[in-house]
Amino acid sequence: MAYPDVYHANDNRYETMPYNRSGNTGLKLPAITLGLWHNFGDDRPLETQREILRTAFDHGVTHFDLANNYGPPQGSAEANFGRIMAKDFAPYRDEMIISSKAGWYMQDGPYGFGGSRKYLVASCDASLKRMGLDYVDIFYHHRPDPDTPIEETVAALDFLVRSGRALYVGVSSYSPELTRRAQKIARELGTPLTIHQPSYSMFNRWIEDELLATCADEGMGVIAFSALAQGLLTDRYLDGVPESSRLGAHKM
C-alpha cells in the first residue's frame, strides 16, 4: 500500500478503539498499544516503520511504548521514532501517549544500568533528546535493581514528574511485594505510580497469582508486554522457524 508523503490522520480513528483508565488516574489508554521493542531499530527500513506507526494511529492506537535500549542498536528505536514523529505526528502530539523506560543495560560503565537517580534522570534526558520531545507521558523503571534502595529509585521517578520530564511514572517486572513498597513511597512523595508493565501471555500467567490484585489494591493500571509470547501464540512458527523471525535471529 502506497502512503502519501504528507500524513493526515484518519478522521474516524477514535470510533472503534476502546479506551480504559489506568488505575485510579484520569489517564485513558487504548485497548491496544504499539510496542517498539524489536521492530523499530536500524535493522528495519524506516519507511516500513513509518507505515506501521501511521496505520496504528489511524486505527486509534494512541499509546507508543519505547525504552532507552530498544533497537538494535540500543537507542535506535527512539531515534527512529523521533524522526517519524517530527515528520508525521508533530501536529498530533497532544493526542499521543509516549512512554519510555530505563533500568536494563544501556552502556558500559557504572552509570549505564540499574535504578539510581543518576542513571534514571540521565537516561530520561537522553531519551527525550533522541525522540525530539519535551516530555514523555509515562516513564518506567524497567526492572528491579537490588543494588539501589527502592527509596532512591522512586524518588528519581518523582523528580522526573516534578521537573516536567514525565507526566506519569510506573514500574515494570516488579514483584507484588516490591510494587506495594514502591507505591507506598511514591504516595508519600506525592507522585503515586500510575501503571505496572509485566510480561503476560497464555504461556506466562504469573501475574494472576498476586500481582493483578496488588495493582488493583494500589490503584495502578496494568499493561502487558509480550502478550503473544513474541509470536509463539500466532501462526508465525507453525511451519518452522523463518530466518527473519525473532526466534530465527535469536532475539527471544
What residue spans do the PLM features occupy?
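Alpha-helix N-cap and loop-to-helix initiation/capping positions
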Residues: 44-48, 76, 80, 111-119, ...
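Short, well-ordered coil/turn segments that N-cap beta-strands
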Residues: 27-32, 60-62, 90-96, 133-137, ...
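Short, acidic/polar
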Residues: 43-57, 114-132, 179-183
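N-terminal binding-site loop/beta-alpha segment at the start of enzyme catalytic domains
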Residues: 1-96, 162
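Conserved, mostly hydrophobic/aromatic
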Residues: 22, 34, 49, 56, ...
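Beta/alpha (TIM)-barrel catalytic core signal, keyed to glycine-rich beta->alpha loops juxtaposed to Asp/Glu
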Residues: 2-16, 144-252
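Conserved hydrophobic residues forming the short capping helix/wall of the S-adenosyl-L-methionine
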Residues: 85-89, 128, 161, 183-186
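N-terminal small/glycine-rich loop or linker at the start of catalytic domains
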Residues: 23-41, 99-112, 135, 140
